[in-house]
Structures are given as C-alpha cells and as structure tokens.
C-alpha cells in the first residue's frame, strides 16, 4: 500500500514515516508539507531518523497522489480540509487524526465520503478506543448521581484544548447517557461558576513537558469515585494505529469510518 504522509516534518509526521518503514505491505509514496516550509526538498526518511529513501518533501499533493493509495493526515484543520478535496478527487483513502476540527470542518469531510473511504478519529490507539467503549458502558450503568469529568494532559506544544481524545471520551459518556455533548459539556471552569449541574460533562486540560497524552475519565458519585485512565508513552502508538486504519480501509466502500469500525468496537 502506497501512502503519503501529510505534515511529514512534524512530530507525528516523522512517527508515521517510521511506522510505514516498520509495517509489512506499506510503502512511503510521498511526503507533504506547507509551501512555505523550509523542509521542502529534504528526504522525508532522513528527517525521521531513517536511511535515505529518495522521497523528498513536497507541497504538491496533487502530483504526489498520482502514485499513491492513501494519505495519513495528522496536521491542522485548515490543511486537512485542503487535503480532503484532493484525496476525494483522486480516490485516496484518507486517514485523519487531526484534532481541533470544527462542526463545519466535519461537514466538509462528510461531503466527500460518497467518493472515498475516510477514517477519522481523535485518537488512533487501541487502548484509547477500548477506553471509550468502557466509558460508554460505565455511563450507561451509572445514573446522574455520578458526575463525569474528563482530565487530559499533553506536551507544551499542543495547540488545541480539550484534546480530540478528551472530546471523544466525553462523547462516549454522552452517548452512554443518550444526551447531546454540546448541551452538557463544561470546559475550563474559572471564577465563581456556581454549583455543578447534574448531568454536566466537565473537561479540564493541562499542558507541559513532553507528555504524549494522558487521559482520565472520572465518575464521581456519592462517597465513591471510579477513574478510567490511559497513558500514552510514545506517539508511535498513534502512528501504528493510523497504519492499521489505512490497511483496513483499503478496498472498503466509500464512507466515513472511525477507529471503532477498524477495531470492531461498539462505541
């Protein structure tokens, strides 16, 4: 399977290049960066700490996509939305791990899924997706006397909050209780907020150091508390998850899929 890595010079992009090199049946077919990037023309494999592959970083997705089967996209919303149109036109499988996507961004992504297979998830790791399944079941089993709080921590360079994974876990809790997350989410409390409302789903974000990703979902009830947690020790778990998603989507009918579909989980 021939794959393009979008954002090839970033932390996740370099991890994806390494994951492709470690995955049987996967080949690096292209490396994409923004036109103004100083990495244009550099060997993508060398940037990832590997022997030279001859695949140079380019800003031209249209040309790269002529000899590719899919694109792995962990970039920023504006870049992902620009890539969506080209991927759909070329019929590329599009694996999207970009976080911070708005409702309008998701509408654009959905609009192309009649033409190609898209796998979109706030987190590509097996552990987090299993955690989401557990959170949904826990929320189904516990009534609103158990307050739900989602706590996440990431490295100092992360630019969006709450993380896509935190929102995914909050959505799992909302789905378990059959409520809308938009109506129940409370983000970043500060000042005189008043008492907590029953049924709220709270979010808190921490930033610092080099943390790849820590997430906890707390169910706080009368006189007891249940905490479900996941700690990512290396971003390679996300990269290998993205490879798994791409291989799973190869040959699938056009549509919008999630990692729950890839892993066969009921979330």
From Swiss-Prot:
The pathway this protein participates in, as annotated, is: Amino-acid biosynthesis; L-lysine biosynthesis via DAP pathway; (S)-tetrahydrodipicolinate from L-aspartate: step 4/4
**UniProt enzyme class:** oxidoreductase
What are the positions of the active site? 154 (proton donor/acceptor), 158 (proton donor)
Reaction equation(s) it catalyzes: (S)-2,3,4,5-tetrahydrodipicolinate + NAD(+) + H2O = (2S,4S)-4-hydroxy-2,3,4,5-tetrahydrodipicolinate + NADH + H(+); (S)-2,3,4,5-tetrahydrodipicolinate + NADP(+) + H2O = (2S,4S)-4-hydroxy-2,3,4,5-tetrahydrodipicolinate + NADPH + H(+)
Q: Which UniProt keywords apply?
A: Amino-acid biosynthesis, Cytoplasm, Diaminopimelate biosynthesis, Lysine biosynthesis, NAD, NADP, Oxidoreductase
Family matches, as InterPro entries: DapB_C, DapB_N, DapB_N_CS, DHDPR_bac, NAD(P)-bd_dom_sf
Disulfide bonds, paired cysteine numbers: none
Listed under GO cellular component are: cytosol
| UniProt entry tagged with the keyword Glycosyltransferase | no
Q: Where does (S)-2,3,4,5-tetrahydrodipicolinate bind?
A: 155, 164-165
Instruction: Specify where it is mainly localized.
Output: cytoplasm
One BP term from GO: diaminopimelate biosynthetic process
EC number(s) of the enzyme? Answer: 1.17.1.8
Q: What does this protein do?
A: Catalyzes the conversion of 4-hydroxy-tetrahydrodipicolinate (HTPA) to tetrahydrodipicolinate.
Q: Mind telling me which NCBIfam families this protein's record contains? A: dapB
Q: Could you say which protein family the record assigns here?
A: Belongs to the DapB family.
Instruction: Kindly provide the name given to this protein in its UniProt entry.
Output: 4-hydroxy-tetrahydrodipicolinate reductase
Instruction: State the encoding gene.
Output: dapB
């Amino acid at each position: 399977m021939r794959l393009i890595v979008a954002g090839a010079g970033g932390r996740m992009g370099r991890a994806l290049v390494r994951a492709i090199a470690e995955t049987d049946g996967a080949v690096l077919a292209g490396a994409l960066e923004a036109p103004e990037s100083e990495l244009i023309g550099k060997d993508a494999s060398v940037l990832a700490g590997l022997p030279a592959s001859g695949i140079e970083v380019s800003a031209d997705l249209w040309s790269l996509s002529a000899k590719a089967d899919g694109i792995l996209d962990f970039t920023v919303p504006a870049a992902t939305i620009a890539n969506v149109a080209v991927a759909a036109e070329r019929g590329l499988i599009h694996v999207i791990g970009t976080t911070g996507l708005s409702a309008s961004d998701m509408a654009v992504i959905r609009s192309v899924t009649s033409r190609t297979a898209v796998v979109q998830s706030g987190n590509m790791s097996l552990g987090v997706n299993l955690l989401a399944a557990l959170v949904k079941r826990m929320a189904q089993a516990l009534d609103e006397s158990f307050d739900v709080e989602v706590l996440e921590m990431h490295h100092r360079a992360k630019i969006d909050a709450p993380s896509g994974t935190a929102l995914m876990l909050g959505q799992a809790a909302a789905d378990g209780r059959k409520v809308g997350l938009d109506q129940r989410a409370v983000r970043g409390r500060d000042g005189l907020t008043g008492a907590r409302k029953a049924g709220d789903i709270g979010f808190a974000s921490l930033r610092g150091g080099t943390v790849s990703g820590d997430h906890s979902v707390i169910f706080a009830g009368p006189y007891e508390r249940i905490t479900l947690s996941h700690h990512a020790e290396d971003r390679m778990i996300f990269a290998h998850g993205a490879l798994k998603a791409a291989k799973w989507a190869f040959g699938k009918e056009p549509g919008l899929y999630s990692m729950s579909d890839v892993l066969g989980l009921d979330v």
